[in-house]
Amino acid sequence: MADSPFTSEQSGNFRGTLEYVPGKQVTLAHVIRNPRKSLCAAVGVDNPGALGIMTITPGEGSIIAADVATKAAAVNVEFVDRFTGCLMMTGEISAVETALTATVQALKEILGFFPAPLTHS
C-alpha cells in the first residue's frame, strides 16, 4: 500500500478528503413524537404533538418538500434552509407522519430522488 497515492509514506495511514457530491436523495425523514418542551425551546418551536425533520440533497429540494408536505397534511413548516436542505415541520403526530411519507414518495416518484425510510422516536 506504500505505492498508493492515498497513503502517507511516513506513517502508512490512509489520507483522504471528504467532499460533497451532488445527488438527489432524502438523507433523513424522522418523526419525533411528543418532544420534550426543552427540545422544542432549543429548536425554537412551540410544543407540538410531533416534530418532523428532513434533510434533502440538493438543498433546494427542501423548498419542494415543504410545498408537498403542507399540501399533504395539516402541518406547520417551522424551518426551511435551501442551502443545507433542512426542513422542520410540526403538527399532530398523524399529520406529520402523513406529510413526511407523502413528501418522500413525491420526491422519489416525481423527481427521481433516492428515498430514506421514515423513522420515529
Label each residue range with its predicted role.
Residues 2-18, 71-76, 80-121:
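C-terminal binding/interaction regions
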Residues 30-31, 39-57:
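Short glycine-/aliphatic-rich beta-strand segments at the starts of folded cytosolic domains
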